[in-house]
Amino acid sequence: MSFNTGTAYAESDADDEYERDIHDSSPIDATDAEASPTESDPPSNEHTPTTYGYRSSADRLPETIISEWTADECADFIATIGLEQYSTRFVENEIVGEALVALLHDDLKSMGIHSVGHRLTILRSVYDVKKAQDVPVESDHYVPLTAENEGQYATAKDIKNLVEQLRLRDERMHLFEQDFRRLAEDFRRLREDMLPALRLAKDAQQPLPHLNNGSAYAGYDTTISPPAPTPSTSGQSGGGLKRQWSTKKIMLGTTPKATSPTHLQTAHDRSLAEQTLDPSSAAERAVMSSSHLAINGLVPSATSPSYPSINIPSPTSPPNTLGGATLASRSYRSDQPTPSSRSTFAESDYAHPGGRDKQPVAPRRMQTPAPDTPSGSNASVEIFKSFRVSMDDPCYKVLPAALKKYQINAPWDQYALYIVYGDQERCLGLEEKPLILFKQLDKEGKKPMFMLRKTNNAQVDIGNEAPGSAGLGSARGAATGYDPPGGII
């Protein structure tokens, strides 16, 4: 890299001319002016920094970065800018590239360069090389005063770069226009080629058939009919229970739940283990059943339309070996319609004063639709959420709470709490925890439910009863005058 011949440095020329003036008006010290070569030395044939009449082999700058120059390369650089008389001083002071980029006026003055113009020439030349090589300029480096305004004016190089960028832009736009014209022509040809094929496809399509006065749906009228009666339903029709289309005949006649097809349930389409009490219609059935028993005073006959004629054993009913010894017969009392809402047994022993003297009748269980019991781990909480009992409460605390919930004003020791799951049932002991047991069975998918049963004993001695007996041990053969109802809860 070399500088063009004839480059003028206005600062140095002005300083040289200014030094020739009177010393009194000059801001430069007299010692500097006396030591200046332009005043003290006789005229010589050597060139000045503005003439560059002498060109040596040092014209060419080193190809390395200025910060990596050696002392000899720095001396060659000083000779290149026309100040060859100071080259030996740079070699003597071992000024390398790192020191050259950080030189200031004071440093050059200490090296014996007393001319302000020569110092400005050296510093400005070093700054130009740093800018050309993209060497970072530190805050303590020399920066010319005119360098602050250099970026505000466009140079010939900037204009050349701008013209080149505009030329490249025009070439790209021309290429884009050619590509767009070619795509438009290809699309036009494709459209012309596809139009005949589209016309043929359109002509080949057949129109959809039209409906003539709904004749297409006439065949469905003959296919919709009630299902044929099955052998199981035909065999039971003589006994009072029959299956109809979308209805089910139950005990209470016409109720909102009776004619709903969603509550259709027979012995052959659902097992008896899933039959539980519907809480939404239990109260209504209990009131009507108790009124019916109180008025007639008789056991419902097998042909009564309000009760089924079949006597199907239930998983909640006691075995035949127990008979009537341990479990009392259920009844609905007309003076207590509310407690009877949870019972599913009916017998005339207590509905009529003379019923016990006539003949004992086995208790009959009414068919009730299965309620929507809550599933999951919170099923026990849903059932006993209003009982005010906790999961750890034993049976002798849960049993009084259940009786109080259903307004059964009877001693709690006259009742036993049974848990029914699947086709099995078990009497809970007084120390067992019903809710924990319910939760365990529900997790196993056995669909448990609780049931209250009245015992024959008047009082139960908790201290003498064995766990799991629920008062049945002392209730053998005992009689009581109070007979509240029991049932499924």
From Swiss-Prot:
GO terms for biological process: signal transduction. InterPro entries: RA_dom, SAM, SAM/pointed_sf, SHANK, Ubiquitin-like_domsf. Disruption phenotype: Impairs the formation of appressoria and the ability to infect rice plants. Leads to reduced MAPK MPS1 activation under stress conditions. Affects OSM1 phosphorylation in response to hyperosmotic stress. Residues 1-56, 207-285, 309-379 are annotated as: Disordered. Residues 69-132 form the SAM domain. Residues 37-54, 256-265, 328-346 have a biased composition (Polar residues). Residues 377-457 form the Ras-associating domain. Pfam families: RA, SAM_2. It comes from the Eukaryota. Keywords: Virulence. Interacts with MST7 and MST11. Interacts with MCK1, MKK2 and HIK1. The sterile alpha-motif (SAM), but not the Ras-association domain, is important for its interaction with MCK1 and responses to cell wall and oxidative stresses. Mitogen-activated protein kinase adapter protein; part of the MST11-MST7-PMK1 MAP kinase (MAPK) cascade that is essential for appressorium formation, penetration and invasive growth. Binds to the MAPKKK MST11 and the MAPKK MST7 to maintain the stability of the MST11-MST7 complex for the phosphorylation of the MAPK PMK1. Is also involved in the MPS1 and OSM1 MAPK pathways, and especially plays a role in the activation of MPS1 in response to cell wall stress. Its function differs in the 3 MAPK pathways. This is Mitogen-activated protein kinase adapter protein MST50.
